[in-house]
Amino acid sequence: MASEMEPEVQAIDRSLLECSAEEIAGRWLQATDLNREVYQHLAHCVPKIYCRGPNPFPQKEDTLAQHILLGPMEWYICAEDPALGFPKLEQANKPSHLCGRVFKVGEPTYSCRDCAVDPTCVLCMECFLGSIHRDHRYRMTTSGGGGFCDCGDTEAWKEGPYCQKHKLSSSEVVEEEDPLVHLSEDVIARTYNIFAIMFRYAVDILTWEKESELPEDLEVAEKSDTYYCMLFNDEVHTYEQVIYTLQKAVNCTQKEAIGFATTVDRDGRRSVRYGDFQYCDQAKTVIVRNTSRQTKPLKVQVMHSSVAAHQNFGLKALSWLGSVIGYSDGLRRILCQVGLQEGPDGENSSLVDRLMLNDSKLWKGARSVYHQLFMSSLLMDLKYKKLFALRFAKNYRQLQRDFMEDDHERAVSVTALSVQFFTAPTLARMLLTEENLMTVIIKAFMDHLKHRDAQGRFQFERYTALQAFKFRRVQSLILDLKYVLISKPTEWSDELRQKFLQGFDAFLELLKCMQGMDPITRQVGQHIEMEPEWEAAFTLQMKLTHVISMVQDWCALDEKVLIEAYKKCLAVLTQCHGGFTDGEQPITLSICGHSVETIRYCVSQEKVSIHLPISRLLAGLHVLLSKSEVAYKFPELLPLSELSPPMLIEHPLRCLVLCAQVHAGMWRRNGFSLVNQIYYYHNVKCRREMFDKDIVMLQTGVSMMDPNHFLMIMLSRFELYQLFSTPDYGKRFSSEVTHKDVVQQNNTLIEEMLYLIIMLVGERFNPGVGQVAATDEIKREIIHQLSIKPMAHSELVKSLPEDENKETGMESVIESVAHFKKPGLTGRGMYELKPECAKEFNLYFYHFSRAEQSKAEEAQRKLKRENKEDTALPPPALPPFCPLFASLVNILQCDVMLYIMGTILQWAVEHHGSAWSESMLQRVLHLIGMALQEEKHHLENAVEGHVQTFTFTQKISKPGDAPHNSPSILAMLETLQNAPSLEAHKDMIRWLLKMFNAIKKIRECSSSSPVAEAEGTIMEESSRDKDKAERKRKAEIARLRREKIMAQMSEMQRHFIDENKELFQQTLELDTSASATLDSSPPVSDAALTALGPAQTQVPEPRQFVTCILCQEEQEVTVGSRAMVLAAFVQRSTVLSKDRTKTIADPEKYDPLFMHPDLSCGTHTGSCGHVMHAHCWQRYFDSVQAKEQRRQQRLRLHTSYDVENGEFLCPLCECLSNTVIPLLLPPRSILSRRLNFSDQPDLAQWTRAVTQQIKVVQMLRRKHNAADTSSSEDTEAMNIIPIPEGFRPDFYPRNPYSDSIKEMLTTFGTAAYKVGLKVHPNEGDPRVPILCWGTCAYTIQSIERILSDEEKPVFGPLPCRLDDCLRSLTRFAAAHWTVALLPVVQGHFCKLFASLVPSDSYEDLPCILDIDMFHLLVGLVLAFPALQCQDFSGSSLATGDLHIFHLVTMAHIVQILLTSCTEENGMDQENPTGEEELAILSLHKTLHQYTGSALKEAPSGWHLWRSVRAAIMPFLKCSALFFHYLNGVPAPPDLQVSGTSHFEHLCNYLSLPTNLIHLFQENSDIMNSLIESWCQNSEVKRYLNGERGAISYPRGANKLIDLPEDYSSLINQASNFSCPKSGGDKSRAPTLCLVCGSLLCSQSYCCQAELEGEDVGACTAHTYSCGSGAGIFLRVRECQVLFLAGKTKGCFYSPPYLDDYGETDQGLRRGNPLHLCQERFRKIQKLWQQHSITEEIGHAQEANQTLVGIDWQHL
């Protein structure tokens, strides 16, 4: 379709390109009706530029639009070339002091916790780095897009409003200056004309609702029949639904559908079909039909191409206006005037109003363009920002109504702009007074919560997804209210007072609808059938919590406002209570001669609600009366006399009784909804305005009434009145065993009631209740949290309530109460309580949950025991109450309280079974302690001549009256002190008696109080000494008893050993043999340990016994026994790679014989080291497979291992494995038990002999191949080559291994082949042996690299599993040839050998520069026995090993010299003196000669020798490890310690001369010709001529990329990253590969790629190209490390970035500055280098099953 249209498009382009912007502008300047001229031009040109075919060409369209449409407008404004005109305007303009940078999605933003007026005040990175705030306590987050930098806004910052860039110069003063003075009259007029026309054009066309025709002045005569089927975005349908629908409707591929869906999601709309009307309408019908089943259908329009064209240009015009006003503030001012100018239709007819009111009808892309324009124009001009704010506030209710009906998120709604006005203090105040904004917002909120019950309270429907969606929208209004209140007024005008109080009235109306909502009644008999709705009410409460606090803060700032608010709140509360007492029968309660009237009400029978916001608001205001002293200054203005304390306490008391009854198990049948409500009532998010305020309200009530009356009402509400008012109730109950659970219930209720009294008296750390500061309250919270256990900063912050600015106030006080302990490698930094703060611990702290209370008690008692103190936890000394609450303390000494205490102590003394509990007693003791503390405080602060009214000690000393004559409380305490059953409370009772004596002494002789104190102490001391002596005696008895038992046990043990001597003898023998294998240090002299060659140190192989982890049977490892195997994991690896871009095009044809030195991809084998019988493992694996098949039929989930790929978990440690390695004895000692003659050939002789043998082998193979097609000539040619003496090519050695071992050799070989080449298993493939040798070599190289990086010695102590793995792997690789075809292995040897010793048989061998010498060495050494087994000439295998090693070493030295860098070094010596230096120079000269002088001149010999030594070290270390594990020769002690250079020791161990060049000199006869053949290779010449590259040595270590120290640099880098597939769109999930540094767009459809026929995410695809299937990524927006392996495995890992408190911040929720922790990054790097990523993922997925369910392949 496109190709047919191309010529037409081109033709149009040409006709348009002839237009001249200058000419058009000239015509316009002459025109009388500019409006008509411009519209005609647009009508003619726009449809010819935009929407010309099925696919948009944005670049082409924009170029044409600029040239033909926007260019003339720019010429018109400037009346000259805009390239000259605009710079002039820019020059005349005064730069703005506002930054105004609009944030991109994911860009870092910074807020200063010290200076920002509220958390919405943010800086961009550039301004932040140039501001004073970088040294303050700042918070860092990533922007969701939209919003702008507040730098330069003096209202946003308490100090430092400007950064370096936007700073005012000393001469400037901030003043409102008219920006138009910088423009000439003409420019103003022209700009005004063109802005008015273009802004109106854009608004008209974007709000145009007809799909097939244009506005009159834009219509053209001829109209084509070209339409678009335009699909619009909504937030209801998922990506999958849209993709599926499009595939059906417009018959496109999935990939195209994904492209459409991505664009629709990003821009808000996309044409999905282009053609005539009918063709497009057909698609629309299908889309609507397919998406209307469950929800409302997707919005689709069939739109004429010219309408679409004009709308596209409308958006372009708005963007253009935004960019043009950037040249001058004057232009910005003109645009603002145009936008806000009332149109002919009066109210709401300005262009800005029209856009705002049509917001919900516009698509996403259009909205974001005009929002962006508003931000860069109206919000950047302070004068017009105010006018815009007024328009916004006027339309507020309508905008919110539209938003409720809108199906887009708030981020793309115009209502989200509220934050820009409402948080600016002067604007917020102006809107509050002029537009009554507070009332408007609350009324708008109430508009949307229509459902009410009969009492007018909110009633929420069941919380469905739709309900939650709508309710979320409504909550945004609360956020707006919060914004308005966030900055408190510093001065009040009458108008502000009046409007705030009007708002307060509206707020009370809102709270009134919440007072008593969601009432509940106790279920009796059967469980509740349907959980009642509770979430919505609590969500509302949570959202309003800060608003309620802020309203109180506002009230506190002005005395008149506070008094009025208090009156209003009280009036509303009285209204709410009006209906409750009607028709209730009053009842009279009396105890101890006191009586009170109250209503008959049972919490357990009537309705009760946990929502009492009006009562709680009044409690808050009452505290403010005390705190601000208004209550004492203007008592006549307050309605304090009207207060009815019983009314005030009624509802809060019911609420607290409800909690007590729930705890006592009385509401079990009411289900989880009630449990959840109680939880949130106490939770840190809600408690400040719920539970805490209920306590305050009760404290208010108690302080205003007779405490006896209060306690009686309380007993009545707790339903305990009967129990305490009836004598002998306890005795009666204990005798009636049937009522066990009722007794238990009553006990709990008594405990809860006592706890409540403790709280009422003890909780006075609220400024206004007690004489304390706000910081004392926070300190106390922290002390009690840390008395449970040491805590991390984030835990501590979570346990403290936040204010509206997300601040807890913790940082200001934490230093005074806690020490900070820095974190280790994994943990977090911890705060520990300072010892001196422990005395402030209160066991009954009101914010403890039950679990926290018991933990804290245990921790504090343990601490006291450790400090050798008694374990009592007495109540701490408390600050005095404020005068308004002072009478509260009398509750402790009133008659009813003393009666309750006495009764409970009486029960404890008489010990009536279950009618009392220790917990109850503990609380009573605590209350007595509190009363004693209070009296002591009163006495110590007594004023002369002032009568002491608090006389608790006197009252507890008096016995009860007749007829009961009960003992005094004091007497009962003394009795209880000796009760054996109350051991746990003895210390506390002792403390109380001591306290009592001290007070008595103070009262007796107030003049000599110190003496009295001292006497009390002496008494106490003597009793304590007695106690100590008693404890000591008991401890001594226990010690003697322990010793006696131990002696008996050892005697029995000895006796048993004597009886079973033979058994023990055997065990000891086995032990020694086992330890010998473990120790690997047989009795060999250290003098000269040699690992290989004829002089190899002979070590007797100890017997090896191992135990199968599955059947626990022990077995010796022998050649003929059943195979024992290690669980192993084989994986492809690029950890050592120097070129990750290489890929194998066709694995089936690839020849892996020669490994390139860039090690582009190797095969690594790891093992956990656990041993099994091969048959046990097979059985285990079969059962895993069967289980997996059954599981797959049941559930379609992944497991952490992939059975189809042979994976399983080690049965013991659950380590991921995919094969097993057989355990073998050293293969060399088994396979070469042949007589060897003493005189072994030298290198030249050996090379000649091997070359001859190779020729014979090749000849025989050719003969074999040619047998079928033999000709006489061939046969003759073959007979010419004589067979060397002693060589028997027809001999095939017998395989010494048992069938079981042979099977395992094949199993592991096939696994290495399958994984290494990514092919299907085929045990007969000739490449299997190559991959076995390759994985052995690569694994050794990996280990050597790790050891070198960590600067550890090559034979230092290796972890057991690693040691076992390397030993088994090397022995396996050496034995594998026995199960391969002999000719195949011989063929590999011949080819490998030919790469060093040239042969005519092979043409295409790699040059010496393209071979990794260690892989070559391993291949040659391990393939050599296949040739040597047919050699009976007496030449030994050891000799062969040595010659191969020497040959490869020399080749490696030549390789090093050819590729070494030859810069001069400053420390070069003038004349070479050393033997090595002369030798190396001579060798270099030889190379120079053979390369035809292409090799650069040598620097000094010293430099050359030094670089060769350094370069060959990795090869020598790898060789040492290889031969050590191959031949079992222990390592010399020198190689087991670090520090020295091991070069000489390695040479000795490996039978090398320390001067390596001797090798060349000793074998010069053969080496010269070999060197010549190596150097003559054309590739070597190309390299030396600079035509190609080569790897130089030593190869540098691969490390993960360098990360920036400050995390925000990373966020900034990622925010600039555009999704590569979405045309410059910012990526939503930028993810950084830590291996290569690539930034990827993860977790989104746009960047999915196809991998092996499956669609996978960008990260998964990248792991295959970069890490051979394993990857490490950092998800930048989440600050989270992601490990991926294969397509189905992954896990999240702790990131290496920590905040100042040593904690990570995954998800960037806390926003503390993050810095790179090198240790943690090194740990991740080590996991990568050790190939442990897959293992780490396996363990993580086993530990956390939710990880298994994640679709990792889509990341």
Swiss-Prot record:
GO cellular component: chromatin; nucleus; ubiquitin ligase complex
Catalytic activity: S-ubiquitinyl-[E2 ubiquitin-conjugating enzyme]-L-cysteine + [acceptor protein]-L-lysine = [E2 ubiquitin-conjugating enzyme]-L-cysteine + N(6)-ubiquitinyl-[acceptor protein]-L-lysine
Name of the encoding gene: Ubr2
Pathway: Protein modification; protein ubiquitination
Zinc finger (RING-type): 1108-1214
Species, as recorded: Mus musculus (Mouse)
Residue sites binding Zn(2+) 5 per the record: C1168, H1170, C1210, C1213
Positions bearing N-acetylalanine: A2
Protein name: E3 ubiquitin-protein ligase UBR2
Residue numbers binding a peptide: F148, D150, D153
